[in-house]
Amino acid sequence: SLFQNCKASGMPVREIFLCDFLSGSTFRAKYKTTVDRYRAAGDEDKNRLKTSLPAVTVSGTFSKRNSAELIAHSGLICIDIDEKDNPDVAEFDRLNELISIIPYVAYCGHSIGGKGYFVIIPIASPEKHKEHFEALRQDFARCGITIDKSGKDVTRLRIYSYDDTAYINPSAATYERTATVRTIYTAA
């Protein structure tokens, strides 16, 4: 589902093919300049610029942006790998080259800030979205990479970005592994 911006929580603007959003010339022509300005901006301007960009729910189509309004899961999960969360990763700017070797990675490109990556992975059991996320978190952690916990949210928005060196694999393998999601309870 395509939403007007990252603050939108109501109805989507329309449905869209993910490939058009990621690499379509229409979005690039309309929003590339804004993304470039965002990447060069100071903190004050970034929030304003970010809310002027469209966003999609990679993991599904929704009548409204909440998990109860999921119409259909896309069979995809999107994870974020941020440089700030991975200070020990040598040559972070070349991480996409390593990620592209992973057979189940369908897409890897720079996030809007240009200092992190978002990775799209086909999953075997959409109804186990969080369990797939947990398994991916564990797999990447074993490689010394921390992924942002926001990927476990099926309603998570992906703000428009572009990457001239994005990795695209339309024949990516499906990620099968799941792991139990641990719930931590706190005393009341």
What are the language-model segments listed below?
Residues 107-113, 148-153:
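Short beta-strand
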Residues 1-75, 184-188:
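DNA replication initiation on ssDNA origins
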Residues 67-72, 100, 108-113:
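Short glycine/proline-enriched loop/turn "hinge" motifs that connect secondary-structure elements
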Residues 1-7, 63-87, 123-188:
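DNA replication initiation modules
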Residues 86-104:
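Short amphipathic alpha-helix segments
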Residues 51-53, 73-76, 103, 114, ...:
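Sequence-level motif detector for i,i+2 pairs with an aromatic at +2
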Residues 35-42, 99-103, 136-144:
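Hydrophobic, Leu/Ile/Phe/Ala-enriched alpha-helical segments that form helix-helix packing faces
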Residues 115-122:
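A generic structural motif
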